[in-house]
Regions:
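C-terminal His-loop and adjacent cap/lid subdomain of alpha/beta-hydrolase
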Residues: 1-325
Length: 325
C-alpha cells in the first residue's frame, strides 16, 4: 500500500495472524493461562480497520461457506480507511470506484464508526453501504460529528508523560496546523459507547441505535450548520452545544498531507459565547441535560457523564465564557 508497505510485498502474513490468534486464545494451553474467553472481538483503527474489509469479505466468508464457526464474535472498525483496503494477495489497494472495498459479508455483527475526516480523503463515501440486519451482514455505520481522524487526545495527550514508544520508532506526532487550536473533540467517549453497543448486540441481541449520518455535499464535504459544524451524525454534548467550529482539517505550516487528517478548532468570540449560553453555570446545566439525552440514546456511557460534562465546561472557560462555577 502506498506509503505503508513496499511494492514487492503483500499482506499475506497478517491474514494468518488474524486467523490463528483467536484459535490459539481458545485453547486451554493458550497464553491466557488457562482462562477461556467467552467471546473474541476484532477491533481495528485507521489502516487496521481497512484490513478488516478484506478479512471479512474473503476469510470470514470462506469459513461460513465451508460450514466452520466464525473465529470472531464481532467486528469493531474505528476510523477505517477504505482507500487503503488491500486486494487479496496483492500490494495494491482495491478499486474504490468499482466498489471492491465495500463490505459484502460479516457473518457476525459489524459496527463501523468514523470521524468526519474519512469521507472524501480516505474513500469512505465510495465504500459506504447501508445499515443492514441481514443475518450474514449485520452492519451499522456511524460518523462522529465534530471528530477528526487525528486529534489532540490521540496525538499529544496520550504521549504527554511517556514518549518512549515514539522514541523507539522515531515518529513524533506534532500538530501541523497554522490554526492555534488542534481538534480536541472527545471522540474516545463515542467509541466507548459504540463498543458497548456492539457488545450488547452480540451478547444480548440488542440492536445498536439508528443514527442519522452526517449530511454531505456533492463534493463529499460535510454540510454545516450556522456555527460551521456538521449536521447529523453521532452527536455528543460538545457538538450540540458548541463553543467553537470543529474543522475537519488544519492548514499545514509546511507542505504536508497531515493537515487533511488532523483537525482544528476555531473558537467562538466571547460575545457569541455569552449570547448563546449566558455564563458557565448556565452552560454546565445545558451540557448536563444533553449528556443525559445522549446516555438515553446510548451515544454516551453513564460512566463517562462526568468526564463529558467537565471536558465541555473546561473548553468553554478556555475560550472565554465566564461567570458562575
Amino acid at each position: 500500500m502506498p506509503g505503508a508497505s513496499f511494492p514487492e510485498t503483500e499482506d499475506g502474513l497478517i491474514w494468518d495472524m488474524l486467523t490463528e490468534l483467536p484459535e490459539r486464545l481458545k485453547r486451554e494451553e493458550s497464553c491466557l493461562g488457562g482462562i477461556m474467553p467467552k467471546r473474541i472481538y476484532l477491533a481495528g483503527w485507521s489502516q487496521s480497520g481497512s484490513l478488516m474489509i478484506t478479512y471479512t469479505n474473503y476469510f470470514a466468508k470462506a469459513d461460513f461457506e465451508a460450514g466452520r464457526k466464525p473465529v470472531y464474535d464481532g467486528w469493531f472498525s474505528a476510523g477505517p480507511a477504505p482507500a487503503c483496503a488491500p486486494a487479496l494477495n496483492q500490494s495494491e489497494c482495491m478499486d474504490a470506484e468499482a466498489g471492491d472495498n465495500k463490505i459484502r459479508f460479516a457473518g457476525v455483527p459489524y459496527l463501523e464508526m468514523h470521524t468526519e475526516s474519512e469521507n472524501a480523503f480516505l474513500g469512505t463515501a465510495a465504500a459506504k453501504i447501508d445499515d443492514s440486519d441481514d443475518p450474514q451482514l449485520q452492519y451499522r455505520f456511524y460518523t462522529i460529528a465534530g471528530a477528526t481522524h487525528d486529534a489532540k487526545s490521540t496525538m499529544r495527550d496520550y504521549y504527554h508523560d511517556d514518549r518512549s514508544d515514539q522514541d523507539k520508532v522515531g515518529v513524533f506526532f506534532v500538530y501541523p496546523g497554522k490554526e492555534p487550536y488542534p481538534n480536541d473533540f472527545p471522540y474516545g467517549m463515542a467509541y466507548c459507547a459504540g463498543l458497548k453497543c456492539l457488545y450488547d448486540w452480540v451478547e444480548k441481541g440488542m440492536e445498536p441505535p439508528k443514527v442519522e449520518d452526517v449530511s454531505v455535499n456533492a463534493d463529499l464535504t460535510n454540510q454545516k450548520d450556522e456555527h460551521g459544524n456538521a449536521l447529523g451524525g453521532w452527536r455528543l454534548p460538545e457538538i450540540e452545544l458548541p463553543v467553537c467550529t470543529y474543522q475537519q482539517f488544519s492548514t499545514p505550516l509546511v507542505k504536508s498531507e497531515s493537515g487533511a487528517l488532523y483537525g482544528s478548532e476555531i473558537p467562538f468570540s466571547v460575545e457569541k459565547l455569552k449570547g448563546l449560553y449566558q455564563d458557565v453555570t448556565h452552560y454546565r446545566r445545558l451540557v448536563e441535560e444533553k449528556a443525559d439525552e445522549a446516555i438515553g440514546k446510548r451515544l454516551l456511557l453513564p460512566e463517562d457523564r462526568e468526564a463529558c460534562v467537565e471536558h465541555a465546561v473546561a473548553k468553554a472557560i478556555k475560550y472565554g465564557l465566564e461567570g458562575g462555577c
